[in-house]
Amino acid sequence: MSKAVLVLEDGRVFTGRPFGATGQALGEAVFSTGMSGYQETLTDPSYHRQIVVATAPQIGNTGWNGEDSESRGERIWVAGYAVRDPSPRASNWRATGTLEDELIRQRIVGIAGIDTRAVVRHLRSRGSMKAGVFSDGALAEPADLIARVRAQQSMLGADLAGEVSTAEPYVVEPDGPPGVSRFTVAALDLGIKTNTPRNFARRGIRCHVLPASTTFEQIAELNPHGVFLSNGPGDPATADHVVALTREVLGAGIPLFGICFGNQILGRALGLSTYKMVFGHRGINIPVVDHATGRVAVTAQNHGFALQGEAGQSFATPFGPAVVSHTCANDGVVEGVKLVDGRAFSVQYHPEAAAGPHDAEYLFDQFVELMAGEGR
């Protein structure tokens, strides 16, 4: 049987067998606790340059289909994939092939047969770190593999939004009669998931998806009713262009909504700082408290950076008073910020789910109300 190894920056090595393509994959080792939704995870652009370790013991049971991908063209964005027990066959009426076949087709290097529980416990105690998956011709002496892992760029300080953003603007038309829309939204693609424009379309909104390099002047030409900041990979401390753009949007009084990376961008635009978490939040059952109502939503999340702040914290900004609106019930991490006057808000989690619960989908309706002038 062929051999594959997962090598961590601190020298820990886990031995298994190849899964998917063979060769070398370098990235940051992170773990995802979702028991389902692996296709959505693999195709989420926020996982760019990360090696995802699945905590669920069996992966691939439902194969691969043409409907659940969260990227255009079904592109897999993870750098590598580590699993315990991959299913050798697909068992689902929508499946068009197996997970391993798709990994091979897209040349994603993976590893199977390792003790993923041990990997996750290690990452929980030591933190997410540089890693590599090696098999076949990429195998070498442990010291050489560790050196390769350590030589790669850290996620801290990585500016990645431009690597996953669309190169050209495109439009997602609203559902319903052609040419009829309630509102127009300018969505900045920092790594947007395809289910987000779908949520706008279902609400009768025309969504212009724009490159991460878009200027305020280009947004203003669209005369949008609102601006959306998407999820995405990398360190938000490097996203100075998007932060400056967000401040221009706020200064113009255009309603604004942000998700995940977009939450960190809005927070920075309002004066908060960000930090790299020890191992982040990646899963589909993470509880979040809304401090305006006291209600808890079970949410889907994928982030390794967060905003500095505390529950209910109020702070002054050039655009008026703001508040930390949401925090994680597990560890108190900031999960949302907003301007008190309501014209800009964001959350760290994913109300569009895909995969995950739909507890927070109402936030899209809140944005619609804001654009209609009812939420001011």
Curated annotation (Swiss-Prot):
Residues 184-376 form the Glutamine amidotransferase type-1 domain. CDD domains: GATase1_CPSase. Its EC number is 6.3.5.5. It catalyses: hydrogencarbonate + L-glutamine + 2 ATP + H2O = carbamoyl phosphate + L-glutamate + 2 ADP + phosphate + 2 H(+). InterPro entries: Anth_synth/Amidotransfase, CarbamoylP_synth_ssu, CarbamoylP_synth_ssu_N, CarbP_synth_ssu_N_sf, Class_I_gatase-like, CPSase_GATase1, GATASE. SUPFAM superfamilies: Carbamoyl phosphate synthetase, small subunit N-terminal domain, Class I glutamine amidotransferase-like. This is Carbamoyl phosphate synthase small chain. The lineage of its organism: Bacteria, Bacillati, Actinomycetota, Actinomycetes, Mycobacteriales.
